[in-house]
Amino acid sequence: MPHAPAINLPDTQLCKSTRRQRLKAVLFAHLPHRRSALKALHWSVLPLLIWFLLVTPSDVLPFGPTAFQIHSLLGLVFVTLCLLWTAGYLRRGLASRPGPKLPLWARRLHRWLHTALIWGLFGVALTGFLLGLTSATLLKAGGILPFAPPLGLHGANQIAGQIHIYEFYLLALLVVAHAGFHIWRHLRLRDNALRIMAPKALHRFL
């Protein structure tokens, strides 16, 4: 019985496809697991958030231009991390899943808290950009990266500045609520919630 002729791809096309697959495998092999990456992101963002809650540009100005540039550079790092976190969420959704011991109301709160934190971080980055956009002078993060072309909108700049400040305080409240929720889970439900994001070195204390 005659067989249908096999459809063979050209050698060049096969080589390109194989190379792409190998390159993709190599790249993904060297990328950290998503949970590991988020854990690193989590503990990188937290100290920066605390820093910007406690220290304002006016606090560092008396220490000279170098101190101000360092403060500004930390802001650039913070914004970059916020945008990476938001991009990961938009691409792949929430990485965190509610544990099986959570009641229905806690499952809903779990999702709401995590989503609000991500959009809160994005909001801080956005209003930071608006501050640069409405400024009368060109602002550069860390003296390196321009914020945006300055439009010199004094009134809008004042509004953006106020929103930016209140966003930080609101974000701090969300962080406290987030931490309190997971501490409650860990102690009351005994579901080891704190071990999810805590470094392994601390697991024996939790």
Where are these regions (language model features)?
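Membrane-embedded alpha-helical bundles that constitute the cytochrome b-like, heme-associated redox core
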Residues: P2-L206
